[in-house]
UniProtKB/Swiss-Prot annotation:
One of its GO terms (cellular component) is membrane. It comes from the Eukaryota. This is Calcium and calcium/calmodulin-dependent serine/threonine-protein kinase. ATP binds at L19, G20, K21, G22, G23, F24, S25, V26, V27, K44. It is a single-pass membrane protein. It comes from Lilium longiflorum. Ca(2+) 1 binds at D409, N411, D413, T415, E420. The modification Phosphothreonine is found at T267. Protein kinase that may be involved in microsporogenesis. Ca(2+) 2 binds at D445, D447, S449, C451, E456. Residues 361-395, 396-431, 432-467, 474-509 form the EF-hand domain.
Amino acid sequence: MSRHESRKLSDDYEVVDVLGKGGFSVVRRGISKSRGKNNDVAIKTLRRYGYTLPGAQRSQPGQRGLSPLGMPTLKQVSVSDALLTNEILVMRRIVEDVSPHPNVIHLHDVYEDANGVHLVLELCSGGELFDRIVAQDRYSESEAAEVVQQIASGLAALHKSTIIHRDLKPENCLFLNQEKRSTLKIMDFGLSSVEDFTDPIVALFGSIDYVSPEALSQRQVSSASDMWSLGVILYILLSGCPPFHAPSNREKQQRILAGDFSFEEHTWKTITSSAKDLISSLLSVDPYKRPTANDLLKHPWVIGDSAKQELIEPEVVSRLRSFNARRKLRAAAIASVLSSKVLLRTKKLKNLLGSHDMKSEELENLRAHFKRICANGDNATLPEFEEVLKAMKMNSLIPLAPRVFDLFDNNRDGTIDMREILCGLSNLRNSQGDDALQLCFQMYDADRSGCISKEELASMLRALPEDCVPADITEPGKLDEIFDQMDANSDGVVTFDEFKAAMQRDSSLQDVVLSSLRTI
């Protein structure tokens, strides 16, 4: 990875539309200036907040391998920097030992600048695994077996190089292109680990639906943990729903730890015993009893000898569509929460602003000035933010404006979200009861529609100070619980009545939300 200022990402690529955003990254489509439009790439920008990568040499395009990086330990950096460090280390190993492989994303190049580290990756334009599946009216066991075969092939190559993915799920499996016979690629190695090489990031953000029993109980995680995740994916492909149903996250964890799933639902009657036997072996609580990726590549069901050609029940496809839609909604909301440096930002804000106590009328005036001054709706540039502070006669805060602005410029695009900064500033005042709830709600009801989206609700939690964050907030699935409790009718938006009812039902939930309005 190069630190030569003479070579910049913009020298080699035209960066165009945004393809997706994650908790600590953004992916954009790039066009090679030397090779033209037929060589589009995906440029994943990993934002960093705490440190600058030490001087390291970037491999030139086409070279195998990235030079060693002298990294600090993960405990010395923030979560976002840990993810950045981890993904670079794992991608380096993939380039050295795995690439090129038809079922593993390929890294073309790496750049670094003040905005972060840019990974230039193979562009996968064929869509996510489940999106592609549910676009069909029906599919067969044989087609599901082809999916498993491709994922197993990628895992076999990764595991041979002692790389554990640790976060295998449908959204991390993308088709290379729109062709019917497109290859499927495993991607997103931010939570991966290289055995005896990197410090794994344990149990932070993985969806609990795919997490193995040993990962939940914080025992040794191995390549067998990836095989468990593949077993869950296969179960969902053949039934349309995850194997471990439970009314609460805690009960779901207990079922996973016990390996408590079944094939009793009526659509399983049409599925071959070979497929069910394979799922049972992959979902064995004992990791040593699970087949390896290489074992799967020789399994009669996976290679097509025993997988049925007949189409699966339409009910399965319908359930999978519903599951997939809800999964995507949650993923967007959770990414919104994670993108805000949940454990760091509010304390930094308080340190900057000291004892400046924002009153309710000041917050409302601030909103009005944002609306009047900002050319781009709810987003403000630094000069616009400084103009807002001047209009509010907050002269003492103007010298701090660049530092406050930087705290809220999540994707380093030179703008901040007015709603985020209002919620952040509201941490410095006291409030309680319905007024506090209404204030929270109105902060993010930007269009005064009377309801807020899941993404907006997630954003509301961004400003939580570390002291007020529940101890188990980073446990897999905990954020899912919060969203489920809010959205009573599962329609993707939350009315004030739903919001208030959720607070009244669960005092611990009220503590979480109202923490954003209390003095820290």
